[in-house]
Amino acid sequence: MRILISNDDGVTAPGLAALHGALVDYAECVVIAPDQDKSGAGSSLTLDRPLHPQTLANGFISLNGTPTDCVHLGLNGLLPETPDMVVSGINLGANLGDDVIYSGTVAAALEGRFLGGTSLAFSLLSRLPDNLPSAAFIARRLVEAQSRLELPPRTVLNVNIPNLPLEHIRGIQVTRLGHRARAAAPTKVVNPRGKEGYWIAVAGDAEDGGPGTDFHAVMQGYVSITPLQLDRTFNDAFEQLHGWLEGVL
């Protein structure tokens, strides 16, 4: 078993080291991660400059690109052997509901879809690393159990872990994505030379966070697992669209 590990917090992030440490004696692990924090990069690819991988003293490969770049190169010739699966994380911060649209952590796992199997993205609901050991233990157990799992090809499992010690985690729930309210307005700033700029505000609160959602599960102390797919076609809109298009052309 060969596992490609990536993240969006950057190659020196504690969550990446924790995930690698949890899996290194289970499988042959290769780490390719951004050389800096790329949170919010989504599934973007770098197309305006060459990418330069550098192998660090700990064996991790640092790349001047996005999480998707990292996995893309890892699956398309950078490595001597193609990985069997992609695992991403452990992100310090939630990736719940609409977060998956922007998340580089989730995007790295989505790029692993080309392997045909199941990829996993792990996030801890904290900006601090205190409970990373619990999250790493859970990640290891889920990666081990994944070998017994039969899901449709190209499924991604988005895993969010409560910020709790392992003994306080109540279990694991399969969930759907909730939804967030719109974020607050950006914060306007002015530099000493009078040039205006804006800081993007934090994500909105849960607007759809009831039972069955990922928001609800983690708030109740459960690990949330949400199966994701790349196909974002809104099938329920087909009938209305067909009717609307009659007579347009």
From Swiss-Prot:
Transmembrane segments: none annotated. It comes from the Bacteria. SUPFAM superfamilies: SurE-like. Keywords: Cytoplasm, Hydrolase, Metal-binding, Nucleotide-binding. It holds the Pfam family SurE. One of its GO terms (molecular function) is 3'-nucleotidase activity. Its cofactor is a divalent metal cation. Nucleotidase that shows phosphatase activity on nucleoside 5'-monophosphates. This is 5'-nucleotidase SurE. It comes from Pseudomonas putida (strain W619). The gene is surE.
